[in-house]
Amino acid sequence: MNKNLITTAFAALLLIACTGMAGAHFTMVFPSDSEDTVWDVSPEDYIASLGETKTVYVMWGHPYEHISFDMSSAPEISVVKPDGTVEKLTPEKITVPGQHEDGTPGDFVAYRASFTVDQDGDSIVLVKYDDADENLIDYCKAVIHCGLEVWEGWDSEVAKEQTEVIPYTRPYGMEEGFVFSGNAKYKGQPLPDATVEVEKYHTLELGKEIVEAAEEKFSYDPPMVFTRQVKTNQNGDFSYTLDEPGIWFVCAAKESDTGGRTIRGVFIVPVLDSFPAKGSASSAELQKAIDEAKSAAQEAKAAAEHAASSATASPAFGAIFVAIGLFAALVITMRRK
């Protein structure tokens, strides 16, 4: 066989293998009103009103690159309510639009289930998904918060016999740049020296744009920015800074010691935009603001001097005119802003 042909074939196989490892698979749990809007998930979707019906969609794929795969089995879905009661939900098989690994569009097998938020506090949606192709079993948790200052239940242990991420940081009200800390456990015990993967979800168009930019800038290893990694300490503790707003996935894995299944605990963290919004004034804008402030001060001084010279009958009239002058200067400044 021609040597060049062998070399080309080997390179092609290597490329295919590398493509298959481009990103981490995650069980994604997104609250939504319909299949048409499921990919437009936001942190606010994880907030509920008392009596509201929440529908959660369960998908399988690479969140960062917005790559989807068919779910090979029906997930087990339950809701652990603030008082500890557990409601098992019936998953309904559906299809959702998405993107294949090669970038072509397609429809993918997914599931959905609904429940009524009937208690104030934090309800935890727990999804068990077994994917034989990837040799993975996920226990994925998403917190649905309800009620003014009823911050109870978000750190509950609900998968005690499996791998689970227990948050130390409350997973709502978090803004970009906050540090998320947690504890990884396996069968109720700390999971030391475990790999924790952290990955942010992107919509389809944004995912394409960011992946293309990453492949150009970090051609030597693009996936290193898709899936970040940290390690737990001897107590199973870990932390990571979630530096952008959006939906984040935090995943701790218990690797099998006997060639069996890898069991993972996945925790979903919705992250808000910075509040209040960060100022982004340039040096030129700051200098302009300083100049305007100086000008306004000079105008206020002139107005005060004019008011004082006009007050002939009584000092009280002078004080009134000074106040009017200062008020006028304030109005001028506010209008300029």
Question: Where are each of the predicted segments found?
Answer:
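N-terminal soluble domains immediately following signal/targeting peptides that reside
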Residues: 23-290
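A generic signature of intrinsically disordered, low-complexity regions enriched in glycine/proline
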Residues: 6-8, 237, 295
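C-terminal low-complexity, Ser/Thr- and acidic/Pro-rich disordered "stalk" regions positioned immediately N-terminal
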Residues: 275-312
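Secretory targeting signatures
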Residues: 1-24, 301-337
